[in-house]
């Protein structure tokens, strides 16, 4: 019996190491179009005001000596400030420990799926919706169930009864609304 052929192409070698459930998946991508308003990438159509640019520049300059270190991974100061702001805005006491911060929505969604869904568990969502919901769910090993929309008010309608029925049928561990 001869030894298996060793692929010379690095991409082929890496592909062989990939989890079976991820083979054939395509990476998330949002086209970068040259248009006045980019709704697909959550960009602001307006330029950053000069005073904001100056404030950011000053803050970066003041922090430059610490750029060789990772920032506070617990986002302590940010969470304390957000808790104080929420308390002030709502009149409800919010502690920093009750505030969750992350490096963008995708990281927070990934944390939710890692904690509550994952391998052998189910995530349910109703498309059209945020395209990362099924991608994050699948890459974390969850089974994705694409819920159905459509009702008396149109093809994108989603009623409480529809949601409850589909949640009961799919028994998901995470529901994206």
Each language-model region and where it sits:
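N-terminal small-domain helix-loop-helix segment of the aminotransferase-like
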Residues: 4-104, 111
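Conserved core of the PLP fold type I
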Residues: 65-177
């Amino acid at each position: 019996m001869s030894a298996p052929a060793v692929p010379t192409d690095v991409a082929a070698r890496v592909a062989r190491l990939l989890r079976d459930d991820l083979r054939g998946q395509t990476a998330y991508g949002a086209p970068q179009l040259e248009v006045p308003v980019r709704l697909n990438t959550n960009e602001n159509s307006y330029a950053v005001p000069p005073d904001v640019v100056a404030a950011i520049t000053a803050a970066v300059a003041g922090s430059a000596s610490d750029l060789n270190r990772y920032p506070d991974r617990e986002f302590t100061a940010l969470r304390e400030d957000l808790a104080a702001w929420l308390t002030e805005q709502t009149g409800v006491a919010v502690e920093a420990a009750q505030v969750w911060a992350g490096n963008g929505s995708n990281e927070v969604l990934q944390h939710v799926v890692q904690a509550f869904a994952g391998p052998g568990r189910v995530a349910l969502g109703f498309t059209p919706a945020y395209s990362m919901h099924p991608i994050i769910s699948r890459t974390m090993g969850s089974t994705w169930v694409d819920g159905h929309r459509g009702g008396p008010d149109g093809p994108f309608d989603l009623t409480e009864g529809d949601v409850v029925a589909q949640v009961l049928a799919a028994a998901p561990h995470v529901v994206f609304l």
